Amino acid sequence: MEKLFKGIAKFRREDFESHRQLFKELGRKQQPHTLFIGCSDSRVVPELITRTRPGELFMIRNVANIVPPYRKTEDFAGTTSAIEYAVHVLDVEAIVVCGHSNCGGCAALHKSPEELQHIPNVARWLDASHEVKERVKKQVVEGTPGAVADRVLEELEATKRREPVGSLAG
């Protein structure tokens, strides 16, 4: 925790002061141009890889950068509610679903229910990608390296998501 507190203090002293006007504007209103849906993995830093500044990306981060099917629900729906907000309130221009290599969430998609029983919420979350995983398994040639298979899975899932996400704008 000490490292975090020192980082916050240094940010206030250095970064905040050198970008005071930007943060003043962001304090009044946000107008991100892009909804960025990415993995919670600590190695993925969206602002760093996209070279964007505070206020440019509206971000959703979750295990395996999954976008569950859109539906009205009484349950908590963090990802879909953030998409609604970005599309209907913030009027973002673009939506990016960003996968990455060596994703633990994508690797967990290939585990048995028994292997995931100690993380039941993650297991349930990954169920949202079960249909896509099965489709990929039929299309991927046997012997395909795991990383390539995972990348194909991510791409197919992103394709599956386009229609439900796009239908929000209409």
Regions found by a protein language model. Name each.
Residues M1-P32, N65-E93, G104-G170:
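Divalent-metal-activated hydrolytic enzyme cores
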Residues H33-F36, E56-F58, E93-V96:
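Structural motif
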Residues I37-C39, R61, C98-H100:
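Short beta-strand segments
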Residues D41-R43, H100-G105:
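Gly/Ser/Thr-rich loops at beta-strand to alpha-helix junctions
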